[in-house]
From Swiss-Prot:
It is found in: Nucleus. Residues 22-38, 57-67, 167-178 have a biased composition (Polar residues). InterPro entries: ChromReg_NeuronalGeneExpr, HMG_box_dom, HMG_box_dom_sf. Residues 80-94, 179-189 have a biased composition (Basic residues). Plays a role in neuronal differentiation. The keyword DNA-binding applies. Keywords: Coiled coil, DNA-binding, Nucleus, Transcription, Transcription regulation. The lineage of its organism: Eukaryota, Metazoa, Chordata, Craniata, Vertebrata. This is High mobility group protein 20A. One of its GO terms (molecular function) is DNA binding. PANTHER family: HIGH MOBILITY GROUP PROTEIN 2, HIGH MOBILITY GROUP PROTEIN 20A-RELATED. SUPFAM superfamilies: HMG-box (SSF47095). Pfam families: HMG_box. GO terms for biological process: regulation of gene expression.
Length: 345
């Protein structure tokens, strides 16, 4: 009977039930919800295929979670610091070439140097940054024709610097400085490349052994006393600097007053020179007139008549003769009076 039943083909109702069971989402080891559904056989082909698909999805989900966890761990790791200049470390400047020609000054710098000294003299109480701001404002408001003067001077200075630089580049001093600069640049590049390279553990240990360790007692009483002494010294230096600046300002005022006095005396001296030249011209004209008018009046007791070169000596001798013999010289005195009256006329 059992063999006969097993040989009977399934009916259409059984096929429909089996189709309904396959359309439901299977779960391994569980039953489908619903009172009308029957439990699935664990060894059915449909259940094995669903379990394989579920296992594949589970493994892919775990792999994605693992990848995302690794990404988060990589993001949480501190990023390696990029190579560059250490914070707090001062960059060393290249040594200056003392033999090189002096660099040219711009028009604004020339105006600032000239105007800054004037402002410091006129207003010594104004601080340096305020003076710089005032000079910058004046330069921006300066007319174009006045500004052109400083720009022309700067252009001349630039031409001078170009010529001197061309001459200097042909000298041995420049060649020596250029070789030293190239060697310094090469050494700096090598040091930077050495810093970029990551040393091994043994190299790190050797570096730590060779590096001296300085124990700086910054919180001890001696260090605090040293800091206080340095602060007191700095305060004293600032005070001395302020006193010297005040003295310098007073001396600048005194120098300006002396300059104005010298200029005033020079103006008076030039006026006196002009007056002297006018008096010399007038005296020369008087000598010429006396020489011309007294040609016929000789000195008493002599035959001496005046000339342009001897008029001063002639007048002195004539005065002595008149004072010595006044009665005998009355005729000469009357003649001289007539001549002088003609001269005045």
């Amino acid at each position: 009977m059992e063999s006969t039943a097993s040989a009977v083909p399934p009916s259409s109702e059984d096929l429909v039930a089996d189709t309904k069971e396959n359309n439901q989402p299977p779960f391994c080891g569980t039953t489908v919800s619903g009172s009308s559904q029957a439990p699935l056989h664990p060894h059915s082909p449909t259940l094995q295929q669903d379990e394989r698909e579920e296992l594949t999805l589970h493994q892919s989900g775990e792999q994605q979670l693992g990848n995302s966890g690794e990404l988060r761990q990589e993001e949480e790791l501190p990023k390696a610091r990029r190579g560059g200049w250490n914070k707090g470390r001062k960059r060393k400047r290249s040594p200056r070439d003392n033999n090189a020609p002096k660099a040219p000054l711009t028009g604004y710098v020339r105006f600032m140097n000239e105007r800054r000294e004037q402002l410091r003299t006129e207003r010594p109480d104004v601080p340096f940054p305020e003076i710089t701001r005032i000079v910058g404002s004046e330069w921006s408001k300066l007319p174009a024709h006045e500004k052109q003067h400083y720009l022309d001077e700067a252009e001349k200075d630039k031409e001078r610097y170009t010529k001197e630089l061309q001459k200097y580049q042909n000298t041995d001093a420049y060649q020596t400085y250029s070789r030293k600069a190239k060697s310094r640049q090469k050494g700096r590049q090598q040091r930077q490349e050495g810093v970029r390279g990551v040393p091994s553990n043994t190299e790190k240990e050797s570096i730590l052994k060779e590096r001296p360790i300085f124990d700086i007692p910054i919180f001890t009483e001696e260090f605090l006393n040293h800091s206080k002494a340095r602060e007191a010294e700095l305060r004293q230096l600032r005070k001395s600097n302020m006193e010297f600046e005040e003295r310098n300002a007073a001396l600048q005022k005194h120098v300006e007053s002396m300059r104005s006095a010298v200029q005033r005396l020079e103006a008076e001296l030039s006026q006196e020179h002009e007056r002297n030249s006018l008096l010399q011209q007038h005296l020369q004209s008087v000598r010429q007139a006396l020489t011309h008018c007294l040609q016929s009046v000789p000195v008493p007791g002599t035959t001496e008549t005046p000339t342009l070169e001897t008029i001063d000596l002639y007048m002195s001798r004539l005065q002595n003769a008149v004072l010595t013999h006044p009665k005998e010289s009355e005729v000469i005195i009357s003649g001289v009076r007539e001549v002088l009256s003609q001269l005045e006329g």
